[in-house]
């Protein structure tokens, strides 16, 4: 592995952000810059509802495990690295309540990132 020589008067960051190749920048970024940023877990929560006899019915589950064991909750869970939020919602609904939800019916409502809302750590959830 060759050592990169940074020209005089230029910061390491400036060199890699502006003058290096994209591959060199990404290699540097993953080693030098990325570790300084906290990383949240990303989850999805599905707000699934329907109308029955003129009333709105909301799909909730009862949590089987901690945290919030036995409490009512929206269907949801952690995203896998290989999926986007819509596919994560579709998978979680299928896993938790055995319902096949068409992707075209899934829309994003909001993102919740309130610090401390999940006792397991920093979690950002995408509500759909």
Predicted regions and their residues:
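N-terminal leader/linker segments that precede catalytic domains of diphosphate-processing enzymes
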Residues: 1-128
């Amino acid at each position: 592995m060759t050592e990169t020589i940074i020209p005089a008067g230029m910061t390491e960051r400036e060199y890699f952000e502006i003058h290096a190749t994209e591959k060199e920048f990404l290699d540097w970024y993953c080693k030098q810059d990325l570790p300084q940023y906290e990383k949240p877990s990303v989850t999805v929560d599905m707000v699934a509802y329907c109308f029955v006899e003129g009333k709105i019915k909301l799909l909730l589950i009862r949590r089987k495990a901690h945290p919030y064991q036995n409490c009512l909750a929206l269907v949801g869970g952690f995203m896998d690295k290989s999926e986007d939020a819509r596919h994560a919602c579709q998978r979680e609904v299928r896993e938790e309540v055995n319902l096949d939800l068409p992707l075209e019916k899934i829309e994003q409502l909001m993102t919740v990132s309130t610090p401390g809302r999940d006792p397991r750590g920093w979690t950002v959830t995408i509500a759909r």
